[in-house]
Amino acid sequence: MVDKRQLLGMTLEELKGVASEVGLPAYAAKQMADWIYKKKITRISEMTNIAVAKRALLEDSFEIGAYPPSEYQKSKDGTIKYLYAAGPGRFVESVYIPTDDRATLCVSSQVGCKMNCLFCMTGKQGFTANLTANQILNQIQSLPENDSLTNIVFMGMGEPLDNVDELFKVLEILTAPYGYAWSPKRITVSTIGVTKGLKRFLEESECHLAVSLHSPYPMERLSLMPVEKAFPAREVIDLIKQYDFSHQRRVSFEYIVFKNLNDSLKHAEALSCLLGGIPCRVNLIRFHAIPNVSLETSDIAKMEAFRDFLNAKGVVCTIRASRGEDIFAACGMLSTAKNVTFV
C-alpha cells in the first residue's frame, strides 16, 4: 500500500503541482485550497466542483490529512489540552485557552525539543522529530473549538525557528487569501533566538515575535538555557534592534520568575538596560514546578515589584495569568514522553 500525501499543509504553489499531476488546470489549485482551508473538508470526495474522475485520481495518491485528537484533558479553569499522533509512537500536545474576550491555541512545532532548558518538561523529553506543515496545521484545523479561535501562539512543544521551513509554510497558509486569511496580528511565534531562523522571520514575516529571555545576565541565562552559548541574548537583541517594531508587529520578551534567582530589582534594572531602545513588552511568567527540578517560583509581591519597576522605567511589563497547571498544560509543562508506549 502506497502512503498517501496530505493536502492539508500544502501551499497554493504545491497544490498547483498536485493539479498538474492529475491533469487538472492550474485554477483547480485554488478550488482545492478553498475546500481544504475555508470549508475544512475531511475527504477529497467532498470537492464537488472537481470532476468525479479527477477526484478519483486524487484519491489514489492523496488524502486531506485532517485527523482528530487522540485524547484531551480539561482544566478546572476551562483550558483544554489535546494530544495528537505525529507518526508511529510519536505524539504532540496543543493547548486551547479560552478567556472572556478571546480564544488562543498554543501550537507545537516539534516532537520534543533540542534546547534542553532547565525549567521545561519538553526539553527534558529530548528531541525526536520536526513536525510537518500538515501536523502543525492539523492541530489548528482539527481543533473541536476551531471556529472560536481568535489567536494562535507557537509556544507549545519545540523551537519553532528550528523548524523554520515548515513553520513558514504554515504561516503562509494561515495568512494568505487562499488559506485562512488571518491577520498576522493574531499570530505570535516564540523563540529562544535561533539566529538564522530569527533573521528570516524578521525579514519575511509580519507576525508577532516572543523571545524567551529569563535573565539579563549571560552566565545566569546559560545555567537556565544552554542555548545561551550558541545564541547569546545580547546578540539576539542586537539583531532585533535592526528591525521596526513601532507599528503593528510586536515583540515581547518572556521572563519566567524564579525565587531568589532572577527576581531582584537588580535584575529588573539590568533588564531595562538590555531592552533599551526596543518598543516591547515583558511578560512575567510564574514558574510551574516540574519533576526533578529544584527551582521555585517567585512570590507575587516580588513579581509585582519587578513589574512596577520596569513600567516606571518605560518598559511595558505585565504578569501573565497561569492557565491549565492542574493538567500539566501551563508554560513549560508540555511533554508526551509518557505517551510513547501507546503506539
UniProtKB/Swiss-Prot annotation:
It catalyses: adenosine(2503) in 23S rRNA + 2 reduced [2Fe-2S]-[ferredoxin] + 2 S-adenosyl-L-methionine = 2-methyladenosine(2503) in 23S rRNA + 5'-deoxyadenosine + L-methionine + 2 oxidized [2Fe-2S]-[ferredoxin] + S-adenosyl-L-homocysteine; adenosine(37) in tRNA + 2 reduced [2Fe-2S]-[ferredoxin] + 2 S-adenosyl-L-methionine = 2-methyladenosine(37) in tRNA + 5'-deoxyadenosine + L-methionine + 2 oxidized [2Fe-2S]-[ferredoxin] + S-adenosyl-L-homocysteine. [4Fe-4S] cluster binds at residues 113, 117, 120. The active site is at residues 93, 331. S-adenosyl-L-methionine binds at residues 158-159, 190, 212-214, 288. Residues 99-320 form the Radical SAM core domain. Specifically methylates position 2 of adenine 2503 in 23S rRNA and position 2 of adenine 37 in tRNAs. This is Probable dual-specificity RNA methyltransferase RlmN. It comes from Parabacteroides distasonis (strain ATCC 8503 / DSM 20701 / CIP 104284 / JCM 5825 / NCTC 11152). The gene is rlmN.
